[in-house]
A protein has these predicted regions:
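Glycine/proline-rich active-site loop of Rossmann-fold NAD(P)-dependent oxidoreductases
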Residues: 123, 136-141, 148-160, 168-170, ...
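Substrate-binding strand-loop-helix patch
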Residues: 151-156, 177-189, 205-223, 261, ...
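Conserved Rossmann-fold NAD(P)-dependent oxidoreductase catalytic core, especially the SDR/UDP-sugar
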Residues: 74-117
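Active-site Tyr-X1-5-Lys
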Residues: 113-141
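Glycine-rich NAD(P)-binding loop of the Rossmann-fold in SDR/ketoreductase-type enzymes
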Residues: 29, 45, 64-72, 112, ...
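C-terminal "lid/loop" region of Rossmann-like NAD(P)-dependent oxidoreductases
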Residues: 203-206, 214-221, 228-243, 248
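Amphipathic terminal alpha-helices
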Residues: 237, 263-276
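NAD(P)H-binding glycine-rich loop region in Rossmannoid oxidoreductase-like domains
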Residues: 28-68
Length: 276
């Protein structure tokens, strides 16, 4: 939100939880209320980044995940169409793809085989957007974010697990995974803003990632370089979570986005923020 305001755009933050960036507290369940908000505030562009934020959240409540991520998204999309919004950017996830590992970067047309309810919820909305793309006046775009990390994240994923263990002087316990692509939170925000106001997008979906492919050992090395060594304990009895390279050139070509913050700098910033 703060990066959007820095572009001199008038912005309204909507979230179910109050925060300094939240102007409206809402959960996207009331379509009539959403339509009134869009009309009253003369909303022209929507960046929809809300909802259940990862497979680790509400993993035991699939009905709740679908209600928030699918029904809530459909409510917002429907009222955007009815309210004359011009652009709708949906923050999807590489989790919509599921496990994959190709030697060459995959593109937007790679098959979606999600492996979690969260991933299924993201794929479901992506399919709806595919069905609507170029068939209505609303300009729609789906950004398939890879693993987002950085200061301020309240849920825990691989980077968070390793960094928090390093800060606590404890081992980091992980399930096995490949060398994943990641995206720092500030880069993810910049990508959403760039896509939202671009006039040159040529496709519906784009992957948003730093081109680095990062292993848990790389993350641990970055913690060590920042002064916080950590030992990894990998549970090899679990299946490997595979993610390979994704196409980042389409985003660069169509809306000028290239991730700037690699994992070493991103982890340094996380540790700095946590130790202030």
């Amino acid at each position: 939100m703060f990066r959007l305001l820095a572009t001199n755009k008038t912005a309204i933050g909507l979230d179910p939880r109050p925060s300094p960036a939240t102007h409206v507290v809402d959960d996207l369940s009331d379509r009539v209320w959403l339509r009134d908000l869009i009309t009253r505030e003369k909303i022209t562009h929507i960046i929809h980044a809300g909802g259940v934020s990862g497979p680790m959240v509400m993993a035991d409540d699939p009905v709740g995940v679908i209600a928030i991520n699918v029904t809530g998204s459909m409510n917002l999309l429907n009222e955007a169409m009815a309210g004359g919004v011009t652009t709708f950017v949906y923050c999807s996830s590489v989790a919509a793809i599921g496990n994959f590992y190709e030697q060459e970067p995959i593109g937007e047309d790679y098959p979606m085989w999600p492996t979690s309810t969260y991933g299924c919820s993201k794929a479901a909305v992506d399919y709806v957007l595919r069905g609507l793309w170029k068939k209505m006046p609303l300009d729609i775009c789906s950004l398939r974010l890879t693993a987002v990390y950085g200061p301020g994240r309240t849920t825990e994923f691989t980077v968070d697990t390793i960094v928090r263990a390093a800060l606590a002087g404890k081992p980091a316990r992980l399930d096995p995974l490949t060398d994943w692509p990641y995206i720092y939170v500030d880069d993810a925000a910049d990508a959403a803003i760039a896509a939202c106001f671009s006039q040159n997008r040529k496709q519906l979906a784009y992957f948003v990632a730093h081109p680095e492919r990062v292993t848990p050992e790389d993350i641990a090395a970055a913690c060590r370089a920042a002064g916080y060594p950590v030992r990894l304990e990998i549970d090899t009895s679990k299946p490997i979570a595979a993610r390979g390279p994704v196409d980042v050139e389409a985003a660069a070509r169509d809306f000028g986005f290239r991730a700037k913050i690699g994992h070493r700098e991103g982890i340094r910033r996380m540790i700095e923020a946590a130790t202030r």
